[in-house]
Amino acid sequence: MTELPRLPAQGGCSNAPILKQRGQREVFCGLTGIIWLHRKMQDAFFLVVGSRTCAHLLQSAAGVMIFAEPRFGTAILEETDLAGLADAQAELDKVVDQLLARRTDIKQLFLVGSCPSEVIKLDLSRAAERMTEKYAPSVRVLNFSGSGIETTFTQGEDACLASMVPVLPKTDTRQLLLVGALPDVVEEQAVSLLEQMGIGPIKVLPAPRADTDLGIGENTVFALTQPFLGDTHGALERRGARHLPAPFPFGEEGTTAWLRVIADEFGVDADTFERVTAAPRARARKAISQASEALRGKTIFFFPDSQLEIPLARFLTRECGMEAIEVGSPFVHKGIIGSDLEMLAQGPVISEGQDVDLQLDRCRAARPDLTVCGLGLANPLEAEGLATKWAIELVFTPVHFYEQAGDLAGLFSRPVRRAGLLKVEAAE
């Protein structure tokens, strides 16, 4: 197959020093992952064991009312629970009994830890084991933490998927596993492209239903669709599955490279690959070219938020003509984002973790044309004359693969255009 143009090793950021700082950080907690996971897993329920603050976060972030009976809820820890005056395990059993009696459609129940449950050391793993014995085989009960003490924004999904891997059945079937929650229409596009190349069987984690025929074994190869799945990556390898390292499928170049790694693994010939990808590649290039006109020559600064930052910086610098000043990520897992680091030209500061005050100082000194940051930082930076993009939008908006490449570029070009218009109006 014809190789993608690659930067020489000395030109990429694979060996660039990583600035590691620890201090005050500004991120959402991992509970926010429930917002997209509950839509993907149609027979699952996410029961957060937490405070009223946790409940308000989920309800407002999801944009649904509780009377609509979504597939998530909160078991409220009262003052008696927090003070140790009540048996929290017994109270949790009562809540789960009531929930499963009312919602007979639930086949997977996730007990989700929060800051309050972590503080009082409530052992949800023990509760999950106890409930699994009680409700099996009708309901599978698992647990993971979405606590802000332990997790950042997107780590909730990682913790959820990692909790599922050990209980998946063993299979010896040669198969491809796509790992990471994607919007249904995006997932269908990816699967369709791979199937047109003759690749199969293709499985997806998370599967929409617990009874889906999904197993893991030594003949399973997996490709990550999200760069924040470090724990899931490790859990799959411990089950014998093999990772296919690749750039992440953002933009035309990243999508083509991601597909090519899989195609090479399954012996797809160059003509077939070209036939399947030529048209969508051309559409993606055209869409990116139109959407990124305002981005060329502009500078960008990433605060750490979702772990999407390094792949997105690669896309914006190589396909949209931007210059990255700093690319901050909560974690830099080179086994996962190594290919993107290799393709990211030397120059930007690569930072892991956060001391938000020090990072704000660097951002103010650099005065980038666009700053990607969390909601809490956006308004203050806008007030200082810096254009911003909410990092959360990059997770909740379909941005993967060819057909969304133009939309991805547009997410960054719109605030840059808006800032330009505001400057013109101010000058007048």
From Swiss-Prot:
<comment type="subunit">
    <text>Protochlorophyllide reductase is composed of three subunits; BchL, BchN and BchB. Forms a heterotetramer of two BchB and two BchN subunits.</text>
</comment>
<feature type="binding site">
    <location>
        <position position="29"/>
    </location>
    <ligand>
        <name>[4Fe-4S] cluster</name>
    </ligand>
</feature>
<keyword id="KW-0411">Iron-sulfur</keyword>
<keyword id="KW-0004">4Fe-4S</keyword>
<dbReference type="GO" id="GO:0016730">
    <property type="term" value="F:oxidoreductase activity, acting on iron-sulfur proteins as donors"/>
</dbReference>
<dbReference type="GO" id="GO:0051539">
    <property type="term" value="F:4 iron, 4 sulfur cluster binding"/>
</dbReference>
<keyword id="KW-0077">Bacteriochlorophyll biosynthesis</keyword>
<keyword id="KW-0602">Photosynthesis</keyword>
<keyword id="KW-0067">ATP-binding</keyword>
<dbReference type="Pfam" id="PF00148">
    <property type="entry name" value="Oxidored_nitro"/>
</dbReference>
<keyword id="KW-0560">Oxidoreductase</keyword>
<keyword id="KW-0479">Metal-binding</keyword>
<dbReference type="GO" id="GO:0005524">
    <property type="term" value="F:ATP binding"/>
</dbReference>
<protein>
    <recommendedName>
        <fullName>Light-independent protochlorophyllide reductase subunit N</fullName>
        <ecNumber>1.3.7.7</ecNumber>
    </recommendedName>
</protein>
<dbReference type="InterPro" id="IPR000510">
    <property type="entry name" value="Nase/OxRdtase_comp1"/>
</dbReference>
<dbReference type="GO" id="GO:0019685">
    <property type="term" value="P:photosynthesis, dark reaction"/>
</dbReference>
<comment type="similarity">
    <text>Belongs to the BchN/ChlN family.</text>
</comment>
<dbReference type="GO" id="GO:0036070">
    <property type="term" value="P:light-independent bacteriochlorophyll biosynthetic process"/>
</dbReference>
<keyword id="KW-0547">Nucleotide-binding</keyword>
<comment type="function">
    <text>Component of the dark-operative protochlorophyllide reductase (DPOR) that uses Mg-ATP and reduced ferredoxin to reduce ring D of protochlorophyllide (Pchlide) to form chlorophyllide a (Chlide). This reaction is light-independent. The NB-protein (BchN-BchB) is the catalytic component of the complex.</text>
</comment>
<dbReference type="InterPro" id="IPR050293">
    <property type="entry name" value="LIPOR_BchN/ChlN"/>
</dbReference>
<dbReference type="GO" id="GO:0016636">
    <property type="term" value="F:oxidoreductase activity, acting on the CH-CH group of donors, iron-sulfur protein as acceptor"/>
</dbReference>
<comment type="pathway">
    <text>Porphyrin-containing compound metabolism; bacteriochlorophyll biosynthesis (light-independent).</text>
</comment>
<feature type="binding site">
    <location>
        <position position="115"/>
    </location>
    <ligand>
        <name>[4Fe-4S] cluster</name>
    </ligand>
</feature>
<feature type="binding site">
    <location>
        <position position="54"/>
    </location>
    <ligand>
        <name>[4Fe-4S] cluster</name>
    </ligand>
</feature>
<dbReference type="InterPro" id="IPR005970">
    <property type="entry name" value="Protochl_reductN"/>
</dbReference>
<keyword id="KW-0408">Iron</keyword>
<dbReference type="GO" id="GO:0046872">
    <property type="term" value="F:metal ion binding"/>
</dbReference>
<keyword id="KW-0149">Chlorophyll biosynthesis</keyword>
